[in-house]
Amino acid sequence: VLLTRPERGVLNFMKNTKVLSRIRRKKGIRKRIFGTSEKPRLTVFRSAKNIYAQAIDDDEGKTLISLSTLSPEVKKEISYGGNINAAEVTGKLLNKKLKEKGVSQVVFDRNGYLFHGRIKSLADQIELKKKQ
């Protein structure tokens, strides 16, 4: 199975069934989830050492807010970005930024990842109503 990604070229996922399964789940989720400016889509990406989250307005195709464990405000509160504690801190600061922006609800997009561990701890810190 070949997948094309503009930033990385063509990737062969034949041997990496874990990545292929996540991408398959991601495509199914994205068919049903859509964000607006009043209710943006909150999507997360998880790497081995960091976690990234962004609120996206799909109507205009713009990112409203983005935050990761590499952001200076998060980095000063954590020692390592790839654990549940870092995801919780990121979620708290993201929740604060969303409230400052005037967002009352979000649609949570787990991006094909299973809803446990770092993804769940980040989502639990978002106090706005969420749907996955």
Regions found by a protein language model. Name each.
Residues 1-13:
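Short, Lys/Arg-enriched N-terminal segments with co-localized hydrophobic residues
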